[in-house]
Amino acid sequence: MSTSDILESLIEKDNGYLITSKAVESGVSKPSVSKYVREHDMEKVAHGIYILDDVWPDELFVLQQRNKNIIYSGETAIYLHGLIDREYSHICFTVPTGYNATHIKKKNKEVRYANPEILDMGTCEIPSSSGNLVKVYDKERCICDLIKDRKKYEIQLYQTAIKEYMSSKKKNLSRLIEYAVKLGVRDEVMMYVEVMV
């Protein structure tokens, strides 16, 4: 397989993105990546990340490619799961406690911290609005976090997300209760389950 073939395969797999680190892992040298980028007039969207000229930048995908420790949570994850129809007002993500996120704490970004014991609980990959896979908390973890931090959310967003989840045929109540116990919100979650299901 030629260098061009390898890079084209990576670009196809990542929906028009060329990620230098993935190319290097596949055996392509950085100078070869740079040459390919120049020859194909690709646009740089972040350090080591390029896109074809007919691809819209996907902020969630790019941010996560640059920062592998982040997991989309809060309003961002709730929106991606379709529990609210209004797009998130800011990007919310969770990182391990002690992680230095000052390089990504910018406008419209909310950083949350979680202990290692619960950080990865309920993670999954789903498509962003642009169709790229991003790592987020599953619906059940989102609902537990929402209930735990209810004062941080607008009442309409809070109620809509809870109602959407509780009326969904794809909810997993045993998983919801398992997470609720681990996150210390079992009683609050059970109140919603008993009333709405």
Question: In which residue ranges do the predicted regions lie?
Answer:
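Short helix->loop/beta-hairpin flanking segments within DNA-binding domains
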Residues: 3-10
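Nucleic-acid-binding surface
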Residues: 6, 16-22, 45, 49-197
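Short, surface-exposed ligand-recognition loops at beta-strand->loop->(often short) alpha-helix junctions
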Residues: 25
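Basic amphipathic alpha-helical segments that dock to polyanions
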Residues: 35-40
